[in-house]
UniProtKB/Swiss-Prot annotation:
Its EC number is 2.3.1.48. Residues 1-346 form the Rtt109-type HAT domain. GO terms for cellular component: chromatin; nucleus. It holds the Pfam family HAT_KAT11. This is Histone acetyltransferase rtt109. SMART domains: KAT11 (SM01250). PROSITE patterns: RTT109_HAT. Residues 345-369 are annotated as: Disordered.
Length: 369
């Protein structure tokens, strides 16, 4: 797995990857009062990427699990604007997600559903970073294309580019991934989608909304579903998606997107035993994780000096809090990476090898009507 990161970063660049994950907690209402909620647990993962003593990228994911079924909700992804030109935030996001998903595969995952809600904002994880002048803030259209690019690399990464030659390769390959995008109020979504493997819809389209749709933090679906639950509504999933267009963030005048990527895996002993960065991350108590996460949100990143100071203080305090925990391994807490990608490799990159691609999507201005 370190190779994945190295091949995504321009030669000569050096990064440090930090990965914290919380212990599992019960999650009795992921699907409201539906029986589907039974036995689900959840844990959080925080990835932070440091370059030259300052954080340049971060991502938080919440993983819900039951048996061999996993739902990965990308809660937040953000940059500070202080990364060098040889480091693509899109590729960093891709590497974080592969690291997380491969870790779930080592746990025996057979079904992994990756989902996220994309809404354009100036900052998500790094306070005041929108003010530093170096941060490239995408508009709503640009953000949708940015996530399409990232998830398309994931889709290709988990799809065999050539037909398996033997039964063992067949067992170790994924079933065909399915990618979905729904943009409330936008009829022509096809212009955002790269190929026929993407579906202009939601992954869940049938049944009763309050029983079939999961509820995630800071997700407009959750607030609406809770209202329907209180009203004891029998609204269908199809009607839910139609009416969501006129509610809350979805009716603000900006484009927002609901993304889903469905992955299915065959398991083999070879993959489960494989020693890779899927083992990354320091497991910490859920309460300590929340305290650590909240601390990050209190540090300023409005200037380079502030960002460097905030990075140093956060890492120092975090290490002091976790290094005495049972089973702490520093190499799982921090991974140092040296970039290996050549400029020509990145420029002429073939999508069949998504690990080496690093593209930053530029925002496109909406046509004024």
């Amino acid at each position: 797995m370190p190779d994945l990161w190295s091949e995504s970063i321009l030669e000569g660049r050096k990064l440090s990857i930090y990965h914290l994950k919380s212990t599992l907690e019960k999650c009795p209402f992921l699907f409201g009062q539906s029986k589907k909620s039974k036995d689900f647990q959840f844990g959080s993962h925080l990835f932070l990427v440091e370059e030259q003593n300052v954080f340049i990228f971060g991502m938080e994911c919440i993983v819900y699990e039951k048996n061999k079924e996993f739902i990965v909700f990308v809660s937040k992804a953000d940059s500070t604007g202080f990364g060098s030109k040889g480091v693509s935030c899109n590729s960093l996001a891709f590497c974080c997600l592969v690291t997380l998903i491969d870790g779930l595969r080592k746990q025996g995952a057979e079904n992994v559903t990756l989902t996220l809600f994309a809404i354009a904002q100036g900052q998500y994880l790094f306070p005041e970073s929108v003010d530093n002048g170096q941060k490239h803030v995408l508009n709503d259209s640009g953000l949708l294309r940015w996530w399409v690019n990232c998830l398309e690399k994931l889709r290709k990464y988990y799809t065999d580019s050539e037909a398996p030659n033997d039964s063992e390769k067949q067992k170790n390959s994924t079933l065909l991934p399915k990618a979905y995008l729904f943009v409330p109020g936008l009829e022509n979504i096809r212009s955002y989608l790269p190929n026929r493997h993407w579906i202009e819809s939601n992954a869940i389209t049938t049944g009763k909304a309050v029983e079939e749709l999961p509820r995630f933090p800071d997700d407009p679906k959750c607030r609406y579903l809770c209202e329907l639950q209180d009203e004891k509504s029998d609204m269908s999933v199809e009607e839910f998606w139609d009416t969501l267009t006129y509610r809350q963030e979805c009716s603000s005048g900006k484009l927002v997107g609901f993304f889903t990527l469905q992955l299915q895996f065959y398991q083999t002993r070879e993959f489960i035993a494989k020693d890779n960065f899927g083992d990354s991350g320091v497991m910490i108590p859920a309460k300590l994780y929340r305290v650590t996460y909240d601390t990050l949100l209190k540090h300023p990143f409005g200037s380079l000096s502030d960002a460097q100071s905030s990075t140093e203080k956060f890492l120092s305090n975090t290490l002091s809090a976790v290094q005495n925990l049972k089973d702490f391994h520093y190499k799982r807490y921090k991974l140092d990476i040296c970039g290996l990608a050549k400029r020509d490799d990145r420029k002429n990159h073939n999508h069949s090898k998504p690990a080496t691609q690093a593209n930053i999507l530029q925002p496109r201005k909406k046509v004024k009507k």
